[in-house]
Amino acid sequence: MQTSELINIGSDTLKRKSIESHRLDSEIILSHVLNTSREKLLISENKVSKENIIKFKSLISRRLYNEPIAYIINRKEFMSENFFVDKNSLIPRPETELLIEPIKRLFEKKSLFFLDIGVGSGCIMFSILKELKNSKGIGVDICKKTIFNAKINLKKLKIVNRAKLLCRPFEEVFNKKFDLIVSNPPYVVKREINRLSNDVKKFEPKQALDGGNDGLDVIKKLFTSLEVFSNLMEF
């Protein structure tokens, strides 16, 4: 079977289940299976092996149940870098990239030592380290599997000597002085979680979404602990 035929089969299968991005998803999944870029996939026509056809159909089946593409291919782009993700890490959002530029602008001529609370995949922390070559950071998360994923990304981006990842509550690192704290904490109101799209509420880690009854549980806990936070830079 040719690549174009397989893309059409995958797209039609997803379309019947009302997956809006059916064509794009089919292309992304096949390019992942064939270990090629989507661009190269679309400009060439090749025969697909039986083994890869089986693998492709298996991944399409996962998408039929609304599993996010990022978890299916274990990859999500953030700030032009591909980050490893699975069900233990919140999928990086494009809008989160908006955090990076102001930090880069404020600290580009300084040596920055910062803390990332709820480091997840490491996309925020590692993007800061990538943009600010004189920076160092500590990332904390309470989930061992999440920290494991972050370590995969840390090694891939070759910034191991400037980063430390710890599996512990953030309060336990407040004995250090940081120039900056960054965090993308859970902020969804508990009663609203069931209203989220299926790909989010069924697959992404609840502890990274659930902000408690008012959506501010972690945020209030953080600000309560900030009494011991010092060494803030003046702007």
Task: Describe the predicted segments one by one.
Residues 95-195:
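Conserved SAM/SAH cofactor-binding pocket of Class I
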Residues 14, 154, 226:
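Conserved hydrophobic residues forming the short capping helix/wall of the S-adenosyl-L-methionine
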Residues 213-235:
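Conserved Class I SAM-dependent methyltransferase catalytic core
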Residues 32-106:
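Conserved AdoMet
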Residues 159, 204, 230-232:
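Helix-to-beta-strand junctions that scaffold the AdoMet/dcAdoMet cofactor pocket
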Residues 103, 128, 200, 222-226:
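Class I S-adenosylmethionine-dependent transferase superfamily signal
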Residues 187-218:
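Mobile active-site "lid"/loop adjacent to the S-adenosyl-L-methionine
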Residues 1-56:
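A short N-terminal interaction module
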